[in-house]
């Protein structure tokens, strides 16, 4: 999967979260959940976009970690929304699954980037010797 495909999936997730929130009831608890998930569910798209424009590997890694945190939080809120039955499970479950898949991809990207950075660092150390 290339970065454009991943960006598109992140944007789709944000749009789906917005639509789900608009379908939530207007109870106090629903509105509290809505505020939380609208923030965490839309920020991965913006943060991933920023990561793709990073000026260095370290900057890229830091931005990916923000994406990871927001996706994890979104999974958390989606789980609560499902368990509290604030929205039909048939609507939330696919969203939850996509969020978890994106989280897995980002975690793998973080691990890959760290491994590559460490390898490059080791190569620089060897070159100095």
Stretches found by the model and what they are:
Residues 1-129:
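Short, C-terminally biased terminal segments at protein or domain edges
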């Amino acid at each position: 999967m290339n970065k454009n495909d991943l960006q598109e999936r992140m944007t789709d997730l944000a749009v789906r979260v917005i639509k789900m929130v608009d379908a939530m009831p207007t109870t106090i608890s629903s509105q509290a959940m809505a505020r939380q998930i609208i923030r965490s569910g839309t920020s991965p798209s913006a943060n991933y976009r920023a990561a793709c424009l990073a000026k260095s590997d370290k900057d890229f890694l830091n931005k990916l970690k923000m994406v990871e945190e927001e996706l994890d939080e979104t999974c958390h809120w989606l789980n609560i929304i499902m368990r509290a039955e604030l929205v039909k499970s048939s609507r939330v479950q696919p969203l939850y699954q996509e969020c978890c898949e994106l989280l897995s991809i980002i975690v793998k990207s973080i691990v890959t980037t760290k491994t590559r950075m460490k390898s490059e660092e080791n190569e620089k150390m060897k070159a100095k010797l």
